[in-house]
């Protein structure tokens, strides 16, 4: 079983970065690059430098990211948005009207996240919500990356590469190292010790930042039954409900949570590491029991 990411985005560190700044910059960029590659087929190489006179940080379109007075994971993700063209291109300016970003893909994505009346504020070089403009905004970071991807597509600078998750996938749990499966005779998802066939394959569909997981053996989908801790996950025929939709939330190094759209709890083995044990639902955190990665 080999782990992999959807994207190939990388970065190069300026050899002149001061030694007392280097480790913090490397840690921030490692997280931001892994986070981004987990969510989509992003590509390119970011040149990363440091400027003692830079108040916080800045970036140019497909050029460099320069850290200054602010170094951290949030800052790295925020500047990556600028590197991809958000707020740094003429195409961005043409799609900002009356303080809102009006690109159709982005409008569809933000309303999927926040409801039919939602819109993406935009002004100067920045957007909000999910712009990661301040330290108190460092949550739901996956939505920042999702919205940057749609902005790139709206601006005509590339595709919505977060859609690359669609296809046949396998998922491995971090704590058990077992593979997500659905036994045809069972009514719930579980874990297998090894890859043996279609029961560990999942046909992933993607729409507006959310995915569905249909088992390769019988086509049934993973569905949440309730909110809260230790709620059951079940296998059910496709019904189009938000209880069958999941949001990938990167935690680092290619791992991610799968948060249900309806109940907002996450797929979790709840500490039962035995092969065949049911996968259930638990309030989302960073525990290895609820972290997953793609394998092949």
Regions found by a protein language model. Name each.
Residues 2-19, 62-63:
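Acidic/histidine-rich, surface-exposed loop or edge segments in extracytoplasmic proteins
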Residues 49-72:
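Active-site scaffold of zinc-dependent metalloenzymes
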Residues 162-296:
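Lectin-like carbohydrate-binding module/patch detector with strong preference for beta-trefoil
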Residues 17-46:
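Zn2+-dependent metallopeptidase catalytic core
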Residues 80-97:
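Catalytic Zn2+-binding segment of zinc metalloproteases
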Residues 71-80:
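Short alpha-helical catalytic segment bearing the HExxH-like zincin motif
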Residues 93-165:
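Metalloprotease/metallohydrolase-associated module, dominated by Zn2+-dependent proteases
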Residues 11, 46-48, 64-67, 82-86, ...:
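Structural recognition of the beta-strand scaffold that forms the well-ordered cores
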């Amino acid at each position: 079983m080999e782990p992999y990411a959807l994207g190939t985005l990388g970065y190069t560190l300026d050899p002149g970065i001061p030694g007392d700044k280097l480790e913090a910059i490397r840690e921030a960029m490692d997280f931001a690059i892994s986070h981004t590659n987990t969510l989509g087929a992003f590509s390119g190489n970011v040149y990363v430098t440091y400027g003692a006179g830079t108040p916080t940080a800045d970036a140019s379109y497909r050029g460099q990211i320069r850290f200054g007075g602010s170094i951290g994971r949030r800052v790295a993700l925020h500047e990556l948005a600028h590197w991809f063209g958000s707020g740094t291109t003429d195409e961005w300016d043409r799609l900002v009207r009356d303080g809102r970003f009006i690109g159709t893909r982005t409008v569809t994505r933000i309303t999927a996240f926040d409801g039919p009346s939602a819109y993406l504020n935009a002004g100067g070089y920045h957007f909000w919500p999910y712009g990661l403009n301040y330290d108190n905004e460092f949550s739901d970071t996956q939505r920042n990356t999702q919205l940057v991807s749609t902005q790139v597509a709206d601006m005509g600078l590339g595709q919505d590469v977060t859609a690359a998750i669609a296809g046949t996938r396998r998922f491995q749990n971090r704590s058990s190292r077992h593979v997500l499966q659905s036994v045809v005779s069972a009514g719930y998802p579980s874990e297998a010790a090894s890859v043996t066939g279609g029961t560990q394959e999942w046909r992933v569909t993607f729409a507006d930042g959310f995915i569905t997981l249909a088992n390769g053996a019988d086509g049934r989908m993973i569905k949440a039954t309730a909110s809260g801790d230790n709620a059951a996950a079940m296998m059910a025929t496709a019904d189009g409900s938000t209880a069958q939709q999941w949001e990938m939330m990167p935690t680092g190094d290619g791992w991610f949570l799968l948060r249900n759209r309806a109940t907002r709890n996450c797929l979790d083995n709840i500490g039962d590491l035995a092969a065949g044990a049911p996968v259930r639902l638990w309030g989302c955190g960073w525990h290895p029991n609820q972290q997953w990665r793609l394998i092949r």
